[in-house]
Amino acid sequence: MDDNTKKELQSAAFDRLLNHLRKRKDVQNIDLMNLAGFCRNCLSKWYREEANKRNIEISDPDAREHIYGMPYSEWKEKYRK
């Protein structure tokens, strides 16, 4: 498999993970952290760090909005238990 195809597949799998987490609002970050060792906030941090490595400025709130699919404050208000 060539590198471009591999990156396309990885990107598609990541998009599916994000969509899955956006649908599963019942799954709390603390549960993800306890079971898997990462949560939505970790994903947003990793996303921002990878952007910064490429000299792309993304704020923490913007990175979180990308991962959560809405502003983090809105998600917390609606779904955090």
Describe the residue ranges of each PLM region.
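Domain-level signature for proteins that mediate thiol-based redox and metal-cofactor handling
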Residues: 1-81
